[in-house]
């Protein structure tokens, strides 16, 4: 609408300009005509009577006002004047026309007078005739021009009327437009008024919802607390139940062994009496030696039974279902009870063989002294066997923790204990014993890998170390085919690790290389680094949860990131291999690694410091993400505390990162920027908490100086260019890992594998001599297991 009005106004302006231009042209033509008429007036004869001219002039002067008044009257009757300027132009134009008409009439009168004079004189000069004919021609032309001017003036009047009508329409349209705009403004004011009212109602509703949300949050946290307490209580009850079950199974095992021993003793009583009767006269009726010999023999038989079949009994007892009576005493099922005769067969072989030997022998060696000596020898053999089986039992217990973690208990099939006595068959028993021996050998190899230098390892030890300690069973086949000893493992380069063992993962290669270098440094008498105690399960689960980034646990599991490999990670490694793309998360992980470096990767020191500040707002550098969430709740910001679950904010970030301020924490907590009081409260609390910790950290860092450098020749120099990144990262972080002899004092040999600590027997000599040489002194019992 506005555009059409603008176009119409422009068109009206253009028409008015054209009309003005036409009027100007007419004025110019009239002026030229006036000049020509003046020239013609000068050509009149001087003999013309003056009275006649004066009369004509007076008549013209008298007629001019009358004609002018008529023209004005006509102009007033033709219609309303559009504007003052247009009316003035019109009046002037009419005045010009009237003046021209007067001049034309004067010229006509002059022409008539000249014609009369010519007629009176009866002829005239040819020159005068020529001039009169020219004047006639010119007069005719002027009349034609005047007609054309009249036509143009009439056309202009028509255009003015048309423009006046268009202007009237435009004014009407503008009035309609103004009316429409007023109605729209009224509607807009109504809409704004309604919107304000609706906004106020929405704000009131939001406040009500916020209060309800706070109530729900409180109820949720109460439920969470109750759930946590119930879970802890259930865990305590479960652990107590497990302890009771284990105790019940031990009592069942003792009951079963007692029954077996009783059956064995009942079976062998007549034979023992037959052996003991002839000796009474020799010792002058004193039977005390026989009783003293029989009691140790019975105990030895019992111990031998327990040692020989402890592993099978444990499997049966763990698998067999238990039925509890009303008094809470767990009883063995009948199916499990049928296996007891099988266990007593070999136990009675010794006594039967000894009795038969005593009956067949009639030599003087059948005396009580000789029999006592033979029984003592048998006791020594039994004691030696008991010690050996005890070690086996302890090894099997540890091995079950290594290879059986996480497996659910399965009840044994009742058909295993049917009358066919399938479990006690020699083939099944031999298979079970062979598996136990294989597991025992693997356990011995793992213990040897933990205690002996790498250069003394054999192929089995290398394979057990790679599978159990390094958690790389996928490379076992290539290792068994190509690596036959620890010496071969020590000389492998990074290229050999990729070609010989088939390790294509650069992170796995780096992990294996760091472990080999750690063992190489340990052979120098400094022991393994503390980072060796941190396996990849601890890093991927416990440590990532502590730093508040559990979402990357799967990537750390995939690349088997342990303590040594963790100490070498850079920003590029985090982004390329572990898919940590956010800069804030990268800084969080790197600062967590820096904290571990300051603690020399000692997990015990870290846990002790965290336990000391668990209920106190001190030492925030070692705080976990959960501890920070607890602190946020303590300062009355619990509605924002859950936003830190996967944010990567932990104590090392708060203390070690100078750019971490209250605004950063507020952003991590998702506190709105318009809540200035909440942000100010958080700033004051953080300032009180972090300032003292940063000041103490600066005082600790000042006397440390630069870390020692490592000048030892490494076997990495012969690696291929494809493993250049692993070499550079290894050289860059060996100081941080603690492989330098200057930083390897007072280190512990023991490692924490993924299944926990294995029991060690016979390592007292190593623990006593650890200060002088922690890996080169071993007892004979340890070296004979190789």
UniProtKB/Swiss-Prot annotation:
Keyword tRNA processing assigned to the entry: answer is no
Q: Name the Pfam families for this protein.
A: SAM_1, SAM_2
Domain SAM intervals: 457-522, 535-599, 623-686
| Family matches, as SMART domains | SAM (SM00454)
Task: Tell me which SUPFAM superfamilies the record gives.
Answer: SAM/Pointed domain
Q: Which residues form a coiled coil?
A: 92-270
Per UniProt, the ranges with Polar residues bias are 742-758
Q: Which domain of life is it from?
A: Eukaryota
**Chain segments carrying region Disordered:** 44-70, 350-425, 703-760
Q: Where is the composition biased (Low complexity)?
A: 52-62
Alphabetical keyword list: Coiled coil, Repeat
Q: What is this protein called?
A: Kazrin-A
Organism, scientific name? Danio rerio
């Amino acid at each position: 609408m506005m555009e059409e009005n603008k176009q119409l106004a422009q068109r009206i302006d253009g028409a008015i300009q054209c009309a003005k231009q036409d009027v100007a042209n007419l004025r110019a033509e009239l002026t030229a005509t006036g000049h020509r008429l003046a020239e013609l007036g000068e050509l009149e004869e001087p003999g013309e009577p003056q009275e006649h001219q004066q009369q004509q002039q007076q008549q013209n002067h008298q007629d001019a006002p009358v004609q002018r008044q008529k023209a004005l009257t006509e102009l007033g009757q033709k219609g309303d004047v559009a504007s003052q300027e247009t009316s003035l132009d019109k009046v002037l134009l009419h005045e010009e026309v009237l003046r021209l008409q007067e001049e034309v009439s004067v010229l006509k009168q002059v022409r008539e007078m000249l014609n009369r004079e010519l007629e009176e004189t009866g002829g005239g000069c040819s020159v005068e005739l020529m001039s009169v004919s020219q004047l006639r021609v010119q007069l005719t032309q002027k009349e034609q021009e005047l007609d054309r001017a009249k036509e143009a003036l009439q056309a202009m009047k028509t255009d003015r009327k048309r423009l006046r009508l268009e202007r009237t329409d435009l004014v009407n349209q503008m009035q309609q437009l103004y009316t429409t705009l007023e109605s729209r403004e009224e509607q807009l004011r109504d809409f704004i008024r309604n919107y304000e009212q609706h906004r106020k109602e929405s704000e009131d509703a939001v406040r009500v919802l916020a209060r309800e949300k706070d109530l729900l949050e409180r109820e949720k946290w109460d439920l969470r607390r109750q759930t946590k307490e119930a879970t802890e209580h259930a865990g305590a009850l479960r652990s107590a139940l497990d302890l009771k079950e284990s105790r019940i199974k031990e009592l069942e095992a003792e009951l079963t062994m007692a029954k077996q021993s009783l059956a064995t003793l009942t079976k062998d009583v007549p034979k023992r009496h037959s052996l003991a009767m002839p000796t009474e006269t020799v010792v002058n009726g004193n039977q005390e030696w026989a009783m003293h010999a029989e009691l140790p023999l019975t105990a030895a038989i019992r111990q031998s039974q327990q040692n020989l079949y402890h592993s099978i009994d444990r499997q049966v007892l763990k698998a067999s279902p238990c039925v509890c009576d009303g008094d809470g005493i767990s009883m063995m099922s009948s199916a499990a009870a049928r296996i007891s005769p099988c266990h007593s067969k070999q136990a009675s072989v010794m006594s039967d063989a000894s009795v038969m030997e005593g009956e067949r022998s009639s030599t003087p060696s059948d005396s009580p002294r000789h029999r006592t000596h033979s029984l003592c020898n048998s006791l020594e053999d039994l004691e030696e066997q008991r010690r050996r089986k005890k070690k086996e039992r302890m090894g099997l217990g540890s091995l079950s923790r290594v290879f059986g973690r996480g497996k659910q208990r399965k009840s044994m099939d009742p058909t295993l204990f049917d009358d066919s006595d399938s479990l006690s068959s020699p083939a099944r028993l031999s298979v079970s014993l062979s598996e136990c021996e294989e597991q025992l050998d693997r356990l011995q190899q793992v213990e040897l890998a933990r205690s002996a230098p790498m250069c003394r390892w054999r192929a089995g030890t290398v394979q057990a170390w790679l599978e159990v300690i390094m958690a790389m069973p996928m490379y076992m086949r290539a290792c068994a085919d190509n690596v036959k000893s620890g010496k071969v493992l020590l000389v492998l380069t990074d290229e050999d690790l990729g070609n010989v063992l088939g390790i294509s993962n650069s992170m796995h290669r780096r992990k294996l290389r760091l472990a080999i270098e750690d063992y190489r440094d340990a052979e120098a008498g400094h022991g393994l680094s503390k980072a060796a105690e941190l396996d990849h399960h601890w890093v991927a689960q416990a440590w990532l949860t502590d730093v508040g980034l559990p979402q990357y646990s799967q990537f750390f599991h995939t690349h088997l990131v342990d303590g040594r490999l963790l100490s070498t990670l850079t920003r590029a490694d985090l982004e390329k291999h572990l898919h940590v793309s956010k800069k804030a998360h990268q800084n969080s992980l790197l600062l967590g690694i820096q904290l571990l470096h300051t603690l020399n990767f000692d997990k015990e020191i870290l846990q002790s410091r965290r336990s000391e500040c668990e209920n106190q707002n001190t030492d925030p550098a070692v705080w976990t993400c959960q501890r920070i969430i607890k602190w946020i709740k303590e300062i009355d910001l619990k509605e924002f505390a859950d936003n830190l679950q996967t944010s990567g904010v932990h104590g090392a970030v708060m203390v070690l990162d100078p750019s971490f301020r209250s605004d950063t924490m507020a952003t991590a907590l998702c506190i709105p920027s318009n809540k200035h009081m909440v942000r100010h409260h958080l700033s004051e609390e953080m300032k009180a908490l972090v300032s003292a910790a940063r000041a103490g950290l600066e005082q600790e860092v000042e006397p440390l100086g630069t870390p020692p450098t490592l000048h030892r020749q490494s076997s990495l120099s012969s690696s291929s260019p494809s493993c250049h990144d692993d070499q550079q990262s290894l050289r860059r972080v060996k100081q941080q890992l603690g492989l330098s002899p200057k930083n390897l004092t007072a280190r512990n040999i023991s490692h924490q594998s993924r299944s926990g600590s294995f029991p060690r027997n016979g390592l007292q000599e190593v623990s006593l001599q650890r200060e002088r040489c922690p890996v080169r002194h071993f007892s004979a019992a340890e070296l004979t297991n190789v």
